Amino acid sequence: MVSFASTLPSLVSFIPSPSSITNASRNPPQPGMICCKFRSELNNEDRFHRRDILQSVGAAVGMDLIARSSAFIEVANAADLIQRRQRSDFQSKIKLTLYDAIKANPDIIPSLLTLALNDAITYDKATKTGGPNGSIRFSSEISRPENKGLDAALNLLEESKKVIDLDSKGGPISYADLIQFAAQSAVKSTFIASAISKCGGNVEKGTLLYSAYGSNGQWGQFDRIFGRSDAQEPDPEGRVPQWDKASVQEMKDKFKAVGLGPRQLAVMSSFLGPDQAATEALLASDPEVLPWIQKYQRSRETVSRTDYEVDLITTVTKLSSLGQVINYEAYTYPPRKIDVTKLKL
């Protein structure tokens, strides 16, 4: 007869409990021991099989490896949390810098929106090139007819980038990220301005209204798309319409080429030129776009403006990720090591 009585307890002991996982780094699990008793007086029917022994040994060793791996998982999770915190802190500094820059130059908002749109909508699905890659920063691209008048917006971001990079511990911000986050800040500024207007110009009440009923919580997915790569050369010409001269059909065709439709074209009206009312009047001439223009105009008259703001955020988020492979470790850095020998107890 073969006794594996000690095997089962050893298996159970290797299953990590929550407390053992927590203390894994301090008390690493010890290898288990499998004891077997053998009696010589066995008949053929009761005789043990070598395969049974190997299975028991394999199970015990496997559970031991699982327990040991818990310490590694704990370290990996801790590193991930540190990186998330680093990226979040850096992103907060970026937003604060852009907020201050836009607040001091509110007239630049329409150009910031168009700059982000024109940088992103160069995406070509067939070749998987273009997109929000910061290529619009190159002089040969920013000087194209469709980008006329956007120099001031780019110059503002250049100055903001100097401030941001000076305070960065994880490397300079990419132009691709900078341009899209500037558009986010610009959009938020228009949302807050609308709330203030609804409160008769009272800044405090308007800000409170936006905090209570606004769409600020809808930016989560956009914020996670952080770590875009910069292009090293301008995107090909002919991919961006001149919005002030293009027909509605041309606009629809361009939006369709990047996976967007009449609904998204309507909600992006503020990105197509400095005069949103004039742009919407043109878009309303198209029967496919008209219902969406009317829907968003009605939404903007409400207190919360939910339909308009949420759909705009969703569309901006999609545009800002076209063709990009996001580096989710961008802007992270090794944490400073603490010399415990110098600590005063």
UniProtKB/Swiss-Prot annotation:
One of its GO terms (cellular component) is chloroplast thylakoid lumen. GO terms for biological process: cellular response to oxidative stress; hydrogen peroxide catabolic process; response to reactive oxygen species. It is found in: Plastid, Chloroplast thylakoid lumen. Gene3D superfamilies: 1.10.520.10, 1.20.58.1620. Pfam families: peroxidase. Its EC number is 1.-.-.-. Keywords: Chloroplast, Oxidoreductase, Plastid, Thylakoid, Transit peptide. GO terms for molecular function: heme binding; peroxidase activity. InterPro entries: Ccp1-like (IPR044831), Haem_peroxidase (IPR002016), Haem_peroxidase_sf (IPR010255), Peroxidase_I (IPR002207). Belongs to the peroxidase family. This is Thylakoid lumenal 29 kDa protein, chloroplastic.
